[in-house]
Amino acid sequence: MYFCGVKDRKKDIRALTKEQLQKFFVAEGDKSFRGTQVYEWLWSKAAHSFDDMTNISKETRQMLKDNFVINHIRVDRMQRSSDGTIKNAVKLHDALTVESVLIPTKSRTTACVSSQVGCSLDCQFCATAKLKRMRNLNPDEIYDQVVAIDNESRLYFDRPLSNIVFMGMGEPLMNYNNVMKAVEKITSPEGLGMSPKRITISTSGVPKMIKKLADDEAKIKLAVSLHSARNEVRTQIMPFNETFPLEDLREALEYWYSKTTSRITYEYIVWKDINDTREDAQALVRFCKYVPCKVNLIEYNPIDDGNFQQAAIEATNMYQDMLERNGITVTVRRSRGKDIDAACGQLANKSA
């Protein structure tokens, strides 16, 4: 059988492949086509209940209820920022909470989704890192975040979701298999049918997994939370850099580009008295020479401990000028959703 035999422990039906569903129905004396129907309801139609499956008989729906559950997420609380950004506090089936964000602009709507409850890493400037990792999200929990934000985009902005960034809670490359299964569902014609080129995975820099991403021929875009191109500084603000130093990261990124020819985006915050010197900017310029890239200079979004402060505008301008003079594409990115703690680095389940 393709489900748990203990009646009080029903299996989440979305853990089954389409082929497993087809075999289940054949074993129950039905046609394999019924499995295809159910699979379509679960993914492309994102059904949250077996009762939603209106082209399936009541008897079959009851049989599904007897054997399976659909562990869908629930938007427990939605907050709207003065700039239009929406933050969802998402309740999981085990009562844990993650957050996801809809970021609207004039031309697009972007979903910022979470991959873990908490985070595996220990970036000192990030509110999520203070939570520590409780567990990885499974593929359907990631998928459901995207579906919820797509629905909100259509409802509030009258257009479908256009882009997805894995920049919410968690380090996506530390939940590699589930993240990639979710991406597969999101991009499949049997799922949401989104182009993988509209999906960006943002990592703090896990060299081994960046190489695996390249070997697996992922068509997504890659962003790296860099924040310093000097090991002594990066280790101070991102302690895991002691294990995964910049030399290893550089090698992995060179490997990524050699396999994919896809340009990398570096996310970079300039902090007062941490990385706001010409020496820091020069180190970034040198690091950018290794592979084709662009740099996003990001406004810092403060968290409660107050240990980090945004550098003066002159420091950001110095970075921008130096990068541009060296032929490196650079964008100064304004934060969205700050007033509801929805901006980059602020997701900490405060609304839960």
Swiss-Prot record:
Its cofactor is [4Fe-4S] cluster. Its EC number is 2.1.1.192. The active site is at E99, C344. It is an enzyme of class 2 (transferase). It comes from the Bacteria. [4Fe-4S] cluster binds at C119, C123, C126. PROSITE patterns: RADICAL_SAM. S-adenosyl-L-methionine binds at G170, E171, S202, S225, L226, H227, N301. GO terms for biological process: rRNA base methylation; tRNA methylation. Disulfide bonds join C112-C344. Its main location: cytoplasm. Binds 1 [4Fe-4S] cluster. The cluster is coordinated with 3 cysteines and an exchangeable S-adenosyl-L-methionine. Gene3D superfamilies: 1.10.150.530, Aldolase class I. It catalyses: adenosine(2503) in 23S rRNA + 2 reduced [2Fe-2S]-[ferredoxin] + 2 S-adenosyl-L-methionine = 2-methyladenosine(2503) in 23S rRNA + 5'-deoxyadenosine + L-methionine + 2 oxidized [2Fe-2S]-[ferredoxin] + S-adenosyl-L-homocysteine; adenosine(37) in tRNA + 2 reduced [2Fe-2S]-[ferredoxin] + 2 S-adenosyl-L-methionine = 2-methyladenosine(37) in tRNA + 5'-deoxyadenosine + L-methionine + 2 oxidized [2Fe-2S]-[ferredoxin] + S-adenosyl-L-homocysteine. CDD domains: Radical_SAM (cd01335). Coiled coil: none annotated. InterPro entries: Aldolase_TIM, Methyltransferase_A, RlmN_N, RNA_MTrfase_RlmN, rRNA_lsu_MTrfase_RlmN/Cfr, rSAM. Reaction proceeds by a ping-pong mechanism involving intermediate methylation of a conserved cysteine residue. Belongs to the radical SAM superfamily. RlmN family. This is Probable dual-specificity RNA methyltransferase RlmN. It comes from Christiangramia forsetii (strain DSM 17595 / CGMCC 1.15422 / KT0803). The gene is rlmN.
